[in-house]
């Protein structure tokens, strides 16, 4: 079995073309943001999988496809992990093999009618497998989940309020399956293995296969078109049927983006200057902020420390908070006594530090190296973390209050940078009573790449999922704000410098989306369906295995479970 699978990786140029087939799919994400392609971008890959002569070849093709997709998706991480990116793609590409096998088994020409129908459920479920596996921090985190490509379309994102980003992925996959079924009905030759490939021959009508009537030939295109319409219309329908949560009140949030400043002290000075400008340029007369958010790693000192430098910086921020009558959420890298290196979000008002959140989900290779004992060599050829940071104990809210008491307290869910990729963290904070989700970010290593734009777009997904407005203040990268349905309120791009004050409508703490309450049921349903489909496939395969009589050495032949024809593997 192992040798047969390895043989599928022969002929390098041929398989490099399958590697390349996964690359164009990333155009659906920022910065290109060709989101409309997501509705059909997977069809070419599906054609390649159905043209595989055997299941093993489909496994290999899916592996190559996944490797190309993953490497292209994370190309901007090359400075962090160097050649480790290629290794990551090669090792993790297998996750797309179940998807390839499902397509190969269910969308081949001549398959019985029930297989294309099953494909509408099984294929999207198998696509969720790599998205589910990657959702674990140690395996890279759920970056560029397929549903996240729709971040610019609040009507489609309405599905996220029902089933998270996973349900948006399912709708997109169903649309791709529908187009593949339609194309297979119109041009079946495109889906057949290449001439000379060893595969089960199709049975001509009248010789073991039932005759297909004219009505039957029209059924598949009709079903495919109906399924595509249902998938494409599901988001707008959900958007129309679910009214937005009524605003319990409105607050003003100022997001500060100093831009690329390499010196740590100068970074703090830049944030302070932009914050001080609020009370000097008349901004407060127009829109007085209730909260001011600085970016990740915005200060070099420990605001809880006792040194003269620590206390001096704390006094400066307290003075700014008093002048603007708003609490300031800063961010620092710190090493508490007796602990390792941590990253803190620190809430400050004129009376001092009011709350701290410690970053829980750390960036693989950027803030720690998984399996450091085995992969420490990456530090000598890349910018991978020289030492592992220590994670916090979990997400929790901070309570923002007005120094003058002019506005009522606001419970805010505070998360840092990479944590915006994880749907569960913002959902946990919403469950704890968060009325607003705040992210602090800094992406200087990736400035000028697609990475910061992809990162910022995730705020729209988290807003739609939780029914909470989401803001992100970036030291470098993109500073953004979205309302509770994922509609864009503000965007400062990678080359921008300044501050923006955004009015955000806060829902009542008791208001929850269905996804807030039900959790990741779509993802777990997909995993269950995939496992069930795999069991069915294995049982049918076992039932139709037979020993070929008279074959030298007693070779075993595999028979197709539906046609009874031998399949050469």
Which role does the model predict for each range below?
Residues 77-81, 110, 135-163, 342-423, ...:
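Active-site catalytic loop in hydrolytic enzyme cores
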Residues 29-44, 257-258, 288-304, 434, ...:
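Short, conserved active-site loops that position catalytic residues or coordinate cofactors/metal ions
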Residues 235-365, 397-409, 414, 418, ...:
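Soluble catalytic regions of membrane-associated enzymes that act on cell-envelope
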Residues 81, 92, 124, 299, ...:
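CN hydrolase (nitrilase-like) catalytic-core segments centered on the catalytic cysteine
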Residues 265-267, 368, 449-450, 515:
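Short conserved micro-motifs at the rims of enzyme active sites and ligand-binding pockets
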Residues 2-240, 448, 459, 474-479, ...:
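Membrane-embedded alpha-helical bundles of multi-pass enzymes
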Residues 51, 107, 285-286, 322, ...:
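Residue-level signal for alpha-helix termini/capping positions
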């Amino acid at each position: 079995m192992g040798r047969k699978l390895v043989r599928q990786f022969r002929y390098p140029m041929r398989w490099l073309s399958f590697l390349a087939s996964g690359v164009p799919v990333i155009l659906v994400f920022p910065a290109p943001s060709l989101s409309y392609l997501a509705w059909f971008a997977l069809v070419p890959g599906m054609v390649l999988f159905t043209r595989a002569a055997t299941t093993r070849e489909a496994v290999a093709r899916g592996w190559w496809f996944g490797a190309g997709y993953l490497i292209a998706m994370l190309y901007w991480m090359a400075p962090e992990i160097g050649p480790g990116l290629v290794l990551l793609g090669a090792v993790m590409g297998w996750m797309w093999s179940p998807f390839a096998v499902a397509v190969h088994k269910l969308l081949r020409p001549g398959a019985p009618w029930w297989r294309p129908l099953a494909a509408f459920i099984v294929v999207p479920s198998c696509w969720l497998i790599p998205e589910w596996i990657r959702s674990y921090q140690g395996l890279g985190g759920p970056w560029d989940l397929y549903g996240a490509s729709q971040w610019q379309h609040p009507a489609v994102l309405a599905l996220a309020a029902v089933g998270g980003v996973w349900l948006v992925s399912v709708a997109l996959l169903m649309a791709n399956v529908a187009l593949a079924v339609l194309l297979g009905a119109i041009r079946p030759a495109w889906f057949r293995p290449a001439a000379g490939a060893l595969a089960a021959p199709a049975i001509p009508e009248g010789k073991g296969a039932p005759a297909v009537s004219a009505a039957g030939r029209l059924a598949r295109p009709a079903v495919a078109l109906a399924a595509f319409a249902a998938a494409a219309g599901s988001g707008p329908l959900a958007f129309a049927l679910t009214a937005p949560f009524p605003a319990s009140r409105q607050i003003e949030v100022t997001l500060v983006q100093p831009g690329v400043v390499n010196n740590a002290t100068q970074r703090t000075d830049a944030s302070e200057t932009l914050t001080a400008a609020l009370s000097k340029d008349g901004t407060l007369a127009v829109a007085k902020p209730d909260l001011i958010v600085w970016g990740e790693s915005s200060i070099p000192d420990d605001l809880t420390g006792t040194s003269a430098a620590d206390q001096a910086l704390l006094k400066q921020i307290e003075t700014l908070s008093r002048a603007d009558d708003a609490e300031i959420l800063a961010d620092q890298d710190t090493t508490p006594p007796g602990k390792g290196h941590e990253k803190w979000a620190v809430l400050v008002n004129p009376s001092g530090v009011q709350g701290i959140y410690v970053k829980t989900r750390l960036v693989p290779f950027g803030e720690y190296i998984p399996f450091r004992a085995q992969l420490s060599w990456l530090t000598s050829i890349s910018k991978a973390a020289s030492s592992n940071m220590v994670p916090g104990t979990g997400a929790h809210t901070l309570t923002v209050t007005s120094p003058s008491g002019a506005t009522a307290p606001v419970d805010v869910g505070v998360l840092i940078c990479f944590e915006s990729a994880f749907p569960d963290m913002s959902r946990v904070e919403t469950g704890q009573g968060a009325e607003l989700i705040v992210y602090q970010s800094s992406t200087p290593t990736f400035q000028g790449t697609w990475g910061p734009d992809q990162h910022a777009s995730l705020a729209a997904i988290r807003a739609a999922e939780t029914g909470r407005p989401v803001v992100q203040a970036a030291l470098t990268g993109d500073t953004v704000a979205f309302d509770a349905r994922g509609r864009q309120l503000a965007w400062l791009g990678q080359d921008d410098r300044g501050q923006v004050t955004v009015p955000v409508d806060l829902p009542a703490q008791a208001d929850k989306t269905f996804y807030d309450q039900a959790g990741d049921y779509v993802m777990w349903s997909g995993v269950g369906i995939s496992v069930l489909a795999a069991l069915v496939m294995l049982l049918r395969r076992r039932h139709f295995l037979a020993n070929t009589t008279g074959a030298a050495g007693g070779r075993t032949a595999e028979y197709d479970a539906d046609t009874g024809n031998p399949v050469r593997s």
